Design a protein with these regions (language model features):
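Bergerat-fold GHKL/Histidine-kinase-like ATPase
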Residues: 1-191
Length: 191
């Protein structure tokens, strides 16, 4: 799985999620995809191919403007990457990697049927999440350094923390929808 992720990352072969908002949502939603895109993601996932998504981030960085003697907020666009792959039930696991560092307490797929990786390597995102990282490198939280450096950062933290589970839920919901449609002709009571 990791070798496949490295290859995809090297070739920049990602599906970019388009979020039509100036601020970040707190989680990835089905509405961010066309129905055909969800169908393609589900098909790729069920064929045990790696799903690779680039998730946009809108960061509001605080700068001290020496000339005006005041703080300014500058909008910065960045992103992080999410990889998912179906595996045998019970063999699932995931990790969040910020630069060279794993952030261990954000794991959500242990013992599931999915392998996952969140990769933070774009420079603005690296800086943002480094400032949000706890001293023991185990989670992202509202640190003093983050509060002093960024404005409106809560949704960015939630977006990353929930990204793997949200994408997995979109896939699972579509699988359930397909499964329900497949059996409705056999079990149509009173319709």
């Amino acid at each position: 799985f990791l070798d496949e992720c490295k290859e995809i990352n090297k070739n920049e072969n990602f599906k970019e999620i388009v979020i039509d908002k100036s601020d970040n949502p707190a989680k990835i939603k089905k509405e961010f995809f066309k129905e055909s895109e969800i169908d393609k993601i589900v098909e790729e996932y069920n064929d045990e191919n790696v799903i690779a998504l680039k998730i946009p981030l809108n960061l509001k960085k605080i700068f001290d403007n020496e000339e005006k003697k005041e703080e300014e907020i500058i909008d910065i666009r960045s992103y992080f990457k999410v990889f998912l792959k179906k595996t045998e039930y019970g063999m699932g696991m995931d990790d969040v990697i910020r630069g060279p560092m794993p952030v261990s307490d954000l794991r959500t797929l242990d013992k599931s049927d999915t392998l996952g990786l969140v990769l933070i390597e774009d420079k603005p995102a690296l800086e943002f999440f480094r400032k949000a990282e706890s001293a023991n490198h185990r989670l992202f939280e509202k640190t003093e350094e983050l509060k002093n450096s960024y404005d409106k950062f809560g949704h960015q933290l939630l977006l990353l923390k929930s990204s793997i589970a949200a994408i997995k839920n979109i896939i699972s919901d579509k699988d359930i929808e397909v499964s329900d449609d497949a059996t409705k002709d056999w079990f149509s009571f009173g319709t």
